[in-house]
């Protein structure tokens, strides 16, 4: 729900309410609001590729690592980067040594869940965009299907109940400004 709710902060109807000058209380001027909204998608493709790199590295390190062979961490990371990365890191980079998400904190082979949560959040929010950002019927359905069940129901089942269909990548791509460059997900 937190990533879903972040969408409201970007709405033109909401952003002026939560942004103001710290001394005067004056709302952020319209031209600044427009620039702030325009910055939302800046480098979003690069950011998405980076998150996919992290997720693929996480999957591969947990699926392929064989302690009898010795250290393969840098080899696997290099292969992943060769496949996905846009910018090569400097030779002294030791990202794998500090990527604690995949070795602690319960995210082992689960880093992809960050991006998957974004997919679900963007798609759920698109239901509101379709009906009106503050549509009470959609809000009630979201409350009943998602919030009220919490962790007592499989997240995908709850999502499908809310949207009446499986998740789609399109809303996240649109929200990220990536759909406008002619990519398709089919």
Map each language-model feature to its residues.
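Cation-handling catalytic/transport regions enriched in His/Asp/Glu
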Residues: 1-186
